[in-house]
């Protein structure tokens, strides 16, 4: 039996596995930088210390890329799940139109949505961090009291899991 070994890191209740080109036989002799810096929440405008979270695992009978696609689609969120999201300011009846700004760089793709009648007021920000993390902020990350972290995991052919964490800051 040959078992491959890969560098791992535990952060905030997650175990990250760095699948390098070649497995290592001596895990004490790995000199690579941490491969998960773009997954760190504090690198994305969010501090753990002021928030509490709840976690849910959700299994789907479809390819994980389809779930990512749904989570990135702002209209899907509010038109399909509009009545289940407890928010009077952001729902399908209020958001008849909006402005959108898209930021693309090598680490992430981010969509920022602004109210049409108040183009300086951000109501939601969705950040996709490849290969499978999505951050959904309620408003600007610097002042947001709510963050949803979605980690998409392929489990097999038309099988996927999403680890959903809801972070909330209380007054």
Describe these PLM feature segments.
Residues 1-16:
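Active-site-proximal cofactor/substrate-binding loop regions of enzyme domains
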């Amino acid at each position: 039996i040959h078992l491959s070994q890969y560098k791992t890191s535990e952060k905030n209740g997650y175990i990250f596995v760095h699948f390098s080109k070649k497995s290592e036989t001596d895990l004490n002799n790995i000199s690579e930088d941490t491969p998960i810096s773009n997954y760190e929440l504090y690198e994305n405008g969010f501090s753990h210390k002021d928030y509490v979270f709840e976690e849910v695992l959700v299994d789907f009978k479809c390819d994980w890329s389809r779930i990512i696609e749904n989570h990135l689609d702002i209209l899907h969120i509010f038109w399909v799940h509009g009545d289940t999201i407890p928010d009077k300011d952001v729902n399908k009846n209020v958001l008849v139109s909006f402005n959108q700004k898209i930021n693309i760089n090598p680490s992430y793709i981010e969509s920022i949505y602004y109210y049409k009648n108040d183009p300086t007021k951000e109501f939601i920000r969705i950040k996709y961090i490849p290969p499978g993390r999505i951050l959904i902020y309620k408003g600007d990350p610097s002042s947001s009291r709510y963050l949803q972290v979605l980690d998409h995991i392929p489990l097999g052919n038309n099988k996927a899991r999403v680890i959903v964490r809801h972070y909330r800051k209380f007054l």
